[in-house]
From Swiss-Prot:
GO terms for biological process: translation. The gene is rplV. It holds the Pfam family Ribosomal_L22. This protein binds specifically to 23S rRNA; its binding is stimulated by other ribosomal proteins, e.g. L4, L17, and L20. It is important during the early stages of 50S assembly. It makes multiple contacts with different domains of the 23S rRNA in the assembled 50S subunit and ribosome. It comes from Crocosphaera subtropica (strain ATCC 51142 / BH68) (Cyanothece sp. (strain ATCC 51142)). This is Large ribosomal subunit protein uL22. The keyword Flavoprotein does not apply. GO terms for cellular component: cytosolic large ribosomal subunit.
Length: 120
């Protein structure tokens, strides 16, 4: 299966309030799959990370359709990755006047779709 990366369309979601490790677990399942297959997988996976990824995948396909005039039925998820964003720092009061730091991680998710090229 060859993918034409010259006509790649992508979408980026920034500052998603979720750990990048948890998001990567879901992205690994859809990378390299067709758009329709990825939609079905995301609909039925039990993870919280599926919701922003599903929204982002639909956005990437809409970008491909609107900006480059590509057919959604031929699209394949060519790239899918999550990078770490800035962590929100919160403090939890502890005994004897101490405070423990709580890190609330964020991530930036990128999904790119490209049309599948038929091998001759």
């Amino acid at each position: 299966m060859a993918v034409d990366t010259t006509t790649e369309a992508k979408a980026i979601a920034r500052y998603i309030r979720m750990s990048p490790f948890k998001v990567r677990r879901v992205l690994d399942q859809i990378r390299g799959r067709s758009y329709r297959e990825a939609l079905i997988i995301l609909e039925f996976m039990p993870y919280r990370a599926c919701e922003p990824i599903l929204k982002l995948l639909r956005s990437a396909v809409a970008n491909a359709e609107h900006n480059q005039g590509l057919d959604p039925t031929t699209l394949v998820v060519s790239q899918a990755y999550a990078d770490g964003g800035p962590s929100l720092r919160r403090y939890r009061p502890r005994a004897q006047g101490r405070a423990y730091q709580i890190r609330k991680p964020t991530c930036h998710i990128t999904i790119a779709v490209a049309p599948q090229v038929e091998d001759n």
